[in-house]
Design a protein with these regions (language model features):
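Solvent-exposed loop/turn and edge beta-strand elements of beta-rich ligand-binding domains
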Residues: 1-393
Length: 393
Protein backbone atom coordinates (compact mmCIF):
# COMPACT_ATOMS: atom_id res chain seq x y z
CA UNK A 1 0.00 0.00 0.00
CA UNK A 2 1.10 3.64 0.13
CA UNK A 3 2.64 6.02 2.67
CA UNK A 4 -0.57 8.04 2.88
CA UNK A 5 -2.42 5.29 4.79
CA UNK A 6 -4.04 7.03 7.75
CA UNK A 7 -6.00 5.88 10.82
CA UNK A 8 -7.98 8.64 12.58
CA UNK A 9 -10.42 9.30 15.41
CA UNK A 10 -12.92 12.17 15.38
CA UNK A 11 -12.92 14.61 18.26
CA UNK A 12 -16.46 15.73 19.14
CA UNK A 13 -15.52 19.15 20.57
CA UNK A 14 -13.96 22.18 18.86
CA UNK A 15 -13.90 20.34 15.53
CA UNK A 16 -13.26 23.53 13.54
CA UNK A 17 -9.84 23.87 15.19
CA UNK A 18 -8.70 20.23 15.05
CA UNK A 19 -7.22 18.17 12.23
CA UNK A 20 -5.57 19.02 8.94
CA UNK A 21 -8.96 19.76 7.40
CA UNK A 22 -10.35 21.43 10.55
CA UNK A 23 -13.09 18.82 10.78
CA UNK A 24 -12.12 17.06 14.01
CA UNK A 25 -10.39 14.08 12.37
CA UNK A 26 -7.00 13.53 14.02
CA UNK A 27 -5.26 10.96 16.26
CA UNK A 28 -6.57 11.95 19.73
CA UNK A 29 -10.02 12.45 21.26
CA UNK A 30 -11.88 12.55 24.58
CA UNK A 31 -15.38 11.29 25.30
CA UNK A 32 -17.95 10.45 27.94
CA UNK A 33 -18.58 6.85 28.91
CA UNK A 34 -21.39 5.57 26.71
CA UNK A 35 -20.52 7.98 23.91
CA UNK A 36 -20.03 6.97 20.28
CA UNK A 37 -16.39 7.15 19.18
CA UNK A 38 -16.04 7.59 15.38
CA UNK A 39 -13.05 6.06 13.55
CA UNK A 40 -11.92 6.00 9.95
CA UNK A 41 -9.11 4.59 7.86
CA UNK A 42 -7.92 6.25 4.66
CA UNK A 43 -5.82 4.65 1.95
CA UNK A 44 -5.58 4.44 -1.83
CA UNK A 45 -5.84 1.49 -4.16
CA UNK A 46 -2.38 0.68 -5.50
CA UNK A 47 -1.50 0.08 -9.13
CA UNK A 48 -2.92 -3.43 -9.54
CA UNK A 49 -2.92 -3.73 -13.33
CA UNK A 50 -0.52 -6.66 -13.09
CA UNK A 51 -2.76 -8.67 -10.74
CA UNK A 52 -5.51 -11.06 -11.75
CA UNK A 53 -7.18 -10.64 -8.36
CA UNK A 54 -6.21 -8.52 -5.37
CA UNK A 55 -6.96 -9.35 -1.72
CA UNK A 56 -7.51 -6.41 0.66
CA UNK A 57 -8.30 -6.64 4.39
CA UNK A 58 -8.30 -4.17 7.27
CA UNK A 59 -7.44 -5.65 10.69
CA UNK A 60 -8.62 -3.77 13.79
CA UNK A 61 -7.90 -4.29 17.48
CA UNK A 62 -9.59 -2.26 20.19
CA UNK A 63 -8.94 -1.65 23.86
CA UNK A 64 -11.34 -3.53 26.16
CA UNK A 65 -12.93 -0.17 27.01
CA UNK A 66 -14.15 0.13 23.40
CA UNK A 67 -17.12 -1.82 22.05
CA UNK A 68 -17.20 -2.21 18.26
CA UNK A 69 -20.50 -1.52 16.48
CA UNK A 70 -20.58 -3.77 13.36
CA UNK A 71 -23.65 -2.01 11.95
CA UNK A 72 -21.73 1.26 11.75
CA UNK A 73 -19.26 0.10 9.08
CA UNK A 74 -19.27 2.11 5.86
CA UNK A 75 -16.80 1.47 3.03
CA UNK A 76 -16.33 3.79 0.05
CA UNK A 77 -14.09 3.59 -3.00
CA UNK A 78 -14.00 7.00 -4.60
CA UNK A 79 -17.62 8.19 -4.49
CA UNK A 80 -19.05 4.66 -4.56
CA UNK A 81 -20.52 3.16 -1.38
CA UNK A 82 -19.83 -0.57 -1.21
CA UNK A 83 -22.44 -3.12 -0.19
CA UNK A 84 -21.84 -5.10 2.98
CA UNK A 85 -22.05 -8.84 2.39
CA UNK A 86 -21.57 -8.39 -1.35
CA UNK A 87 -18.48 -6.24 -1.91
CA UNK A 88 -16.94 -6.78 1.53
CA UNK A 89 -17.64 -8.64 4.76
CA UNK A 90 -17.17 -7.76 8.42
CA UNK A 91 -15.55 -10.68 10.23
CA UNK A 92 -15.54 -10.96 14.04
CA UNK A 93 -14.90 -14.69 14.53
CA UNK A 94 -12.16 -17.04 13.39
CA UNK A 95 -9.58 -14.26 13.53
CA UNK A 96 -6.51 -13.83 15.79
CA UNK A 97 -7.51 -13.51 19.46
CA UNK A 98 -5.93 -10.08 19.84
CA UNK A 99 -8.01 -8.64 16.99
CA UNK A 100 -11.53 -7.22 17.29
CA UNK A 101 -12.66 -7.51 13.67
CA UNK A 102 -11.57 -7.54 10.04
CA UNK A 103 -13.09 -5.95 6.96
CA UNK A 104 -12.27 -8.18 4.00
CA UNK A 105 -12.54 -7.42 0.29
CA UNK A 106 -11.79 -10.71 -1.41
CA UNK A 107 -10.99 -9.08 -4.76
CA UNK A 108 -10.38 -5.34 -4.70
CA UNK A 109 -9.60 -5.29 -8.42
CA UNK A 110 -12.93 -6.87 -9.36
CA UNK A 111 -14.75 -4.49 -7.02
CA UNK A 112 -13.16 -1.42 -8.63
CA UNK A 113 -13.89 -2.79 -12.10
CA UNK A 114 -17.52 -3.34 -11.08
CA UNK A 115 -18.06 0.25 -10.01
CA UNK A 116 -15.79 2.13 -12.39
CA UNK A 117 -15.34 0.07 -15.57
CA UNK A 118 -18.47 -2.07 -15.99
CA UNK A 119 -19.83 0.16 -18.76
CA UNK A 120 -16.51 -0.05 -20.60
CA UNK A 121 -16.26 -3.83 -20.43
CA UNK A 122 -14.32 -5.11 -23.42
CA UNK A 123 -13.42 -1.64 -24.66
CA UNK A 124 -10.72 -0.60 -22.17
CA UNK A 125 -7.64 -2.84 -22.10
CA UNK A 126 -6.62 -4.07 -18.64
CA UNK A 127 -3.30 -2.27 -18.78
CA UNK A 128 -5.05 1.05 -19.46
CA UNK A 129 -7.41 0.96 -16.49
CA UNK A 130 -6.63 3.46 -13.76
CA UNK A 131 -6.31 2.23 -10.20
CA UNK A 132 -5.56 4.57 -7.32
CA UNK A 133 -9.02 5.41 -6.06
CA UNK A 134 -9.34 6.67 -2.50
CA UNK A 135 -10.61 4.04 -0.05
CA UNK A 136 -12.38 5.25 3.11
CA UNK A 137 -13.48 2.86 5.86
CA UNK A 138 -15.58 4.41 8.64
CA UNK A 139 -16.98 2.74 11.76
CA UNK A 140 -17.88 3.45 15.38
CA UNK A 141 -17.20 2.10 18.81
CA UNK A 142 -18.74 2.94 22.17
CA UNK A 143 -16.62 3.92 25.16
CA UNK A 144 -17.88 1.32 27.63
CA UNK A 145 -17.81 0.91 31.41
CA UNK A 146 -14.38 -0.73 31.40
CA UNK A 147 -13.15 2.86 31.19
CA UNK A 148 -14.33 3.55 34.77
CA UNK A 149 -11.05 2.47 36.38
CA UNK A 150 -8.74 4.00 33.76
CA UNK A 151 -9.65 7.67 33.49
CA UNK A 152 -6.78 9.96 32.49
CA UNK A 153 -3.60 8.36 31.22
CA UNK A 154 -2.76 6.18 29.32
CA UNK A 155 -6.03 6.35 27.36
CA UNK A 156 -7.71 3.70 25.22
CA UNK A 157 -5.95 2.79 22.00
CA UNK A 158 -7.32 1.48 18.71
CA UNK A 159 -4.94 -0.06 16.15
CA UNK A 160 -5.34 -0.83 12.46
CA UNK A 161 -3.20 -2.53 9.85
CA UNK A 162 -3.81 -3.55 6.24
CA UNK A 163 -3.22 -6.93 4.67
CA UNK A 164 -2.92 -7.01 0.89
CA UNK A 165 -1.76 -9.11 -2.06
CA UNK A 166 1.90 -8.57 -2.87
CA UNK A 167 2.63 -11.17 -5.53
CA UNK A 168 1.18 -10.43 -8.98
CA UNK A 169 2.14 -13.92 -10.13
CA UNK A 170 -0.28 -15.55 -7.66
CA UNK A 171 -4.05 -15.79 -7.98
CA UNK A 172 -4.61 -13.30 -5.16
CA UNK A 173 -5.06 -15.96 -2.49
CA UNK A 174 -1.38 -16.61 -1.89
CA UNK A 175 1.27 -14.28 -0.54
CA UNK A 176 0.18 -11.13 1.26
CA UNK A 177 1.96 -8.21 2.84
CA UNK A 178 1.03 -6.06 5.82
CA UNK A 179 1.40 -2.44 6.82
CA UNK A 180 2.61 -1.55 10.33
CA UNK A 181 -0.09 -1.04 12.95
CA UNK A 182 -1.38 2.55 13.05
CA UNK A 183 -2.78 3.75 16.39
CA UNK A 184 -5.11 6.44 17.74
CA UNK A 185 -6.17 7.07 21.34
CA UNK A 186 -9.23 8.19 23.36
CA UNK A 187 -9.41 9.61 26.89
CA UNK A 188 -12.06 10.20 29.53
CA UNK A 189 -12.02 12.05 32.86
CA UNK A 190 -13.71 12.28 36.28
CA UNK A 191 -14.70 14.75 38.99
CA UNK A 192 -14.18 13.83 42.63
CA UNK A 193 -16.56 15.93 44.72
CA UNK A 194 -16.91 16.43 48.46
CA UNK A 195 -19.72 18.21 50.29
CA UNK A 196 -18.74 20.24 53.40
CA UNK A 197 -20.02 23.04 55.62
CA UNK A 198 -18.37 26.45 56.07
CA UNK A 199 -17.09 25.89 59.60
CA UNK A 200 -13.53 25.42 60.85
CA UNK A 201 -12.75 22.60 61.03
CA UNK A 202 -15.13 21.72 58.22
CA UNK A 203 -17.62 18.89 58.54
CA UNK A 204 -18.28 16.46 55.69
CA UNK A 205 -21.97 16.50 54.84
CA UNK A 206 -23.98 13.42 53.97
CA UNK A 207 -27.21 13.41 51.98
CA UNK A 208 -26.73 16.31 49.56
CA UNK A 209 -28.31 15.47 46.20
CA UNK A 210 -27.07 16.58 42.78
CA UNK A 211 -27.82 16.36 39.09
CA UNK A 212 -25.41 17.14 36.25
CA UNK A 213 -26.26 19.12 33.11
CA UNK A 214 -24.53 20.10 29.89
CA UNK A 215 -26.20 23.52 29.53
CA UNK A 216 -26.51 26.51 31.84
CA UNK A 217 -30.32 26.39 31.84
CA UNK A 218 -30.08 22.86 33.24
CA UNK A 219 -32.47 21.36 30.69
CA UNK A 220 -30.04 18.85 29.14
CA UNK A 221 -29.29 16.39 31.91
CA UNK A 222 -26.15 14.28 31.81
CA UNK A 223 -27.55 11.06 33.22
CA UNK A 224 -25.49 9.01 35.66
CA UNK A 225 -25.88 5.68 37.42
CA UNK A 226 -24.15 3.96 40.31
CA UNK A 227 -20.73 2.85 39.11
CA UNK A 228 -20.37 -0.86 38.44
CA UNK A 229 -16.65 -0.43 39.09
CA UNK A 230 -14.97 2.37 40.93
CA UNK A 231 -16.30 4.69 43.59
CA UNK A 232 -19.17 6.89 42.55
CA UNK A 233 -21.47 7.49 39.60
CA UNK A 234 -20.82 6.69 35.95
CA UNK A 235 -22.02 8.86 33.07
CA UNK A 236 -24.63 7.45 30.68
CA UNK A 237 -23.96 9.40 27.48
CA UNK A 238 -27.03 10.22 25.38
CA UNK A 239 -25.64 8.14 22.51
CA UNK A 240 -26.43 5.09 24.66
CA UNK A 241 -29.99 6.14 25.43
CA UNK A 242 -32.78 4.40 23.52
CA UNK A 243 -35.55 6.52 21.99
CA UNK A 244 -34.33 9.58 23.88
CA UNK A 245 -35.93 8.33 27.09
CA UNK A 246 -34.42 8.67 30.53
CA UNK A 247 -32.65 5.39 31.36
CA UNK A 248 -34.27 3.27 34.05
CA UNK A 249 -30.94 2.98 35.87
CA UNK A 250 -30.37 6.77 35.94
CA UNK A 251 -29.82 8.01 39.49
CA UNK A 252 -29.57 11.23 41.42
CA UNK A 253 -26.14 11.65 42.98
CA UNK A 254 -26.04 11.64 46.79
CA UNK A 255 -23.05 12.56 48.96
CA UNK A 256 -22.06 9.60 51.16
CA UNK A 257 -21.05 9.39 54.83
CA UNK A 258 -17.78 11.16 54.00
CA UNK A 259 -19.49 13.84 51.91
CA UNK A 260 -18.14 12.23 48.74
CA UNK A 261 -19.82 12.14 45.33
CA UNK A 262 -17.66 11.18 42.35
CA UNK A 263 -18.61 11.47 38.67
CA UNK A 264 -16.78 9.08 36.33
CA UNK A 265 -16.47 9.18 32.54
CA UNK A 266 -16.55 12.86 31.59
CA UNK A 267 -15.56 14.69 28.43
CA UNK A 268 -13.31 17.73 28.22
CA UNK A 269 -16.10 20.35 28.25
CA UNK A 270 -18.32 22.54 30.44
CA UNK A 271 -20.77 20.99 32.90
CA UNK A 272 -23.30 22.41 35.37
CA UNK A 273 -23.67 20.75 38.76
CA UNK A 274 -27.03 21.50 40.36
CA UNK A 275 -27.82 20.76 43.99
CA UNK A 276 -31.39 19.45 44.23
CA UNK A 277 -31.48 18.80 47.97
CA UNK A 278 -29.29 20.19 50.74
CA UNK A 279 -28.31 18.18 53.83
CA UNK A 280 -30.75 18.57 56.73
CA UNK A 281 -30.38 21.97 58.40
CA UNK A 282 -28.42 23.54 55.53
CA UNK A 283 -29.39 25.97 52.81
CA UNK A 284 -29.80 24.81 49.22
CA UNK A 285 -27.51 26.18 46.53
CA UNK A 286 -29.99 27.85 44.22
CA UNK A 287 -27.58 28.35 41.31
CA UNK A 288 -25.74 25.53 39.54
CA UNK A 289 -21.96 25.34 39.82
CA UNK A 290 -20.32 25.81 36.43
CA UNK A 291 -17.43 23.37 35.99
CA UNK A 292 -14.99 23.63 33.09
CA UNK A 293 -12.79 20.62 32.32
CA UNK A 294 -10.07 21.29 29.76
CA UNK A 295 -7.55 18.77 28.42
CA UNK A 296 -4.58 19.94 26.35
CA UNK A 297 -2.85 17.57 23.94
CA UNK A 298 0.52 17.74 22.23
CA UNK A 299 0.26 19.13 18.71
CA UNK A 300 2.55 16.48 17.25
CA UNK A 301 0.46 13.69 18.78
CA UNK A 302 -2.72 15.20 17.38
CA UNK A 303 -1.59 14.14 13.90
CA UNK A 304 1.15 11.58 14.53
CA UNK A 305 0.27 9.56 17.61
CA UNK A 306 2.71 6.78 18.45
CA UNK A 307 1.47 3.69 20.27
CA UNK A 308 2.14 3.98 24.00
CA UNK A 309 2.48 7.77 24.00
CA UNK A 310 -0.84 8.09 25.84
CA UNK A 311 1.02 7.21 29.03
CA UNK A 312 3.40 10.17 28.58
CA UNK A 313 3.19 13.94 28.45
CA UNK A 314 3.64 13.81 24.68
CA UNK A 315 -0.11 13.30 24.34
CA UNK A 316 -2.16 14.44 27.35
CA UNK A 317 -0.01 17.38 28.42
CA UNK A 318 -2.29 19.30 30.77
CA UNK A 319 -5.57 18.78 32.59
CA UNK A 320 -7.11 21.98 33.92
CA UNK A 321 -10.44 22.53 35.64
CA UNK A 322 -12.26 25.43 37.25
CA UNK A 323 -15.51 25.96 39.13
CA UNK A 324 -17.67 29.08 39.16
CA UNK A 325 -20.00 29.64 42.12
CA UNK A 326 -22.89 32.06 42.70
CA UNK A 327 -24.20 32.64 46.23
CA UNK A 328 -26.80 34.82 47.96
CA UNK A 329 -26.64 34.50 51.73
CA UNK A 330 -27.76 36.87 54.51
CA UNK A 331 -28.74 39.49 51.94
CA UNK A 332 -25.33 39.48 50.28
CA UNK A 333 -24.67 38.35 46.71
CA UNK A 334 -21.29 36.90 45.77
CA UNK A 335 -19.84 35.32 42.66
CA UNK A 336 -16.42 33.72 42.51
CA UNK A 337 -14.34 31.11 40.72
CA UNK A 338 -11.81 28.54 41.85
CA UNK A 339 -9.15 26.66 39.95
CA UNK A 340 -9.53 23.02 40.86
CA UNK A 341 -6.72 20.69 41.85
CA UNK A 342 -6.28 18.06 39.15
CA UNK A 343 -4.41 14.78 38.77
CA UNK A 344 -3.45 14.21 35.15
CA UNK A 345 -2.51 10.55 35.68
CA UNK A 346 -5.97 9.63 36.95
CA UNK A 347 -7.75 12.31 34.91
CA UNK A 348 -9.33 13.74 38.06
CA UNK A 349 -10.57 17.22 38.96
CA UNK A 350 -11.31 17.73 42.68
CA UNK A 351 -14.14 20.02 43.77
CA UNK A 352 -15.38 21.06 47.22
CA UNK A 353 -19.00 22.23 47.43
CA UNK A 354 -19.94 24.21 50.57
CA UNK A 355 -23.32 24.44 52.32
CA UNK A 356 -24.18 27.04 54.96
CA UNK A 357 -26.76 27.01 57.76
CA UNK A 358 -29.47 29.53 58.67
CA UNK A 359 -32.28 31.33 56.91
CA UNK A 360 -32.02 32.46 53.34
CA UNK A 361 -34.10 34.78 51.17
CA UNK A 362 -35.86 32.81 48.44
CA UNK A 363 -33.71 34.18 45.66
CA UNK A 364 -31.98 32.69 42.67
CA UNK A 365 -28.84 34.69 43.21
CA UNK A 366 -29.25 36.93 40.17
CA UNK A 367 -28.54 40.67 40.29
CA UNK A 368 -32.10 41.34 39.07
CA UNK A 369 -33.52 39.42 42.03
CA UNK A 370 -31.45 41.53 44.42
CA UNK A 371 -32.81 44.72 42.84
CA UNK A 372 -36.38 43.47 43.13
CA UNK A 373 -35.87 42.50 46.78
CA UNK A 374 -34.45 45.97 47.47
CA UNK A 375 -37.35 47.65 45.68
CA UNK A 376 -39.86 45.57 47.63
CA UNK A 377 -38.25 46.57 50.92
CA UNK A 378 -38.46 50.25 50.00
CA UNK A 379 -42.17 49.95 49.20
CA UNK A 380 -42.86 48.28 52.56
CA UNK A 381 -41.04 51.06 54.44
CA UNK A 382 -43.08 53.71 52.61
CA UNK A 383 -46.36 51.98 53.46
CA UNK A 384 -45.44 51.71 57.16
CA UNK A 385 -44.53 55.41 57.39
CA UNK A 386 -47.80 56.38 55.72
CA UNK A 387 -49.86 54.27 58.14
CA UNK A 388 -48.12 55.80 61.18
CA UNK A 389 -48.96 59.29 59.96
CA UNK A 390 -52.61 58.33 59.50
CA UNK A 391 -52.75 56.93 63.06
CA UNK A 392 -51.36 60.18 64.52
CA UNK A 393 -54.05 62.17 62.74
Amino acid sequence: MCSSDLKQIREDDLRASIGNNKDGWNDVGDYEIGQTVPYRYLTYAPNINGYQTYYFAMHDRMDKALTFNPDSVNVKIGDKVLENGVDYKVVTSGIPSDETFQIQITDLKATINKYFYAEYEGTVPENEKFYGQKIVVEYNATLNENAQLDTGRPGFENDVKLEYSNNPDSDGTGQTGETPWDTVVAFTFRIDGVKVNDQTPEIKLQGAKFRLYSNKDCTEEVYVKKATAGDGYTVINRDSIKNGEKPAEAAEMVSDNDGVFNIIGLDSQTYYLKETQAPAGYRLLKDPVKIDVKATYGKDNRDNYVKGDGATDKTLQKLEASAHFKEFYSGAYSEYGNDLITDIETGTANIKVVNKVGSKLPASGSALTLILVGAGTAVMVTVLIKRRKEVKR
